[in-house]
Amino acid sequence: MWVNKYIDDCTDEDLNDRDFIASVVDRAIFHFAINSICNPGDNKDAMPIEQCTFDVETKNDLPSTVQLFYEESKDNEPLANIHFQAIGSGFLTFVNACQEHDDNSLKLFASLLISLSYSSAYADLSETVYINENNESYLKAQFEKLSQRDMKKYLGEMKRLADGGEMNFDGYLDKMSHLVNEGTLDPDILSKMRDAAPQLISFAKSFDPTSKEEIKILTDTSKLIYDLFGVKSEK
């Protein structure tokens, strides 16, 4: 598989870092795969290989472009199975909501939460994978830089929609209300959705695209996004 060849190229035998590189790449691939599902229109005119690439640089300065969608991980298990278990059902709900409702505001909030989670790969990996000191700080910085870049992009678009009066969840909430009437959605969940919607619009309006400060998404804001999607936050 292409991805294994690229991981090999990135690996420094003296550092014995292949398992770490492979694990980081696997997690990055999954996040970008989900991101692509939520935002298929961003690269709709690109060829698959152009849509699905991710650059990894290691301490030995060998860049690697890996194909995002591939059938098996380094452990010969389907990639999605490994990472859906790691992340939980929340992102599945985000993906389903984005596809079903085709609402750009929903997609942006889902994408924001996904980009926020890029750096969480280290929390998962540190418990199961040996992280070489020579790679840890460098790769952490790369993931954080990527996370900040994507969050700024999504927040900027969210602010544009909110300031222009184009961020409106009425249609989405009406659909959810019908589900309550049909008995397929808990009224308490709809209540949380209704409470979250105006707060998230205010949050989007408050973003300052000219600020040079690090973007931080508070836990309370993350919880509001979960509430909007009807997902119970584990935090």
From Swiss-Prot:
It comes from the Bacteria. It comes from Escherichia coli (strain K12). This is Uncharacterized protein YjbM. InterPro entries: DUF2713.
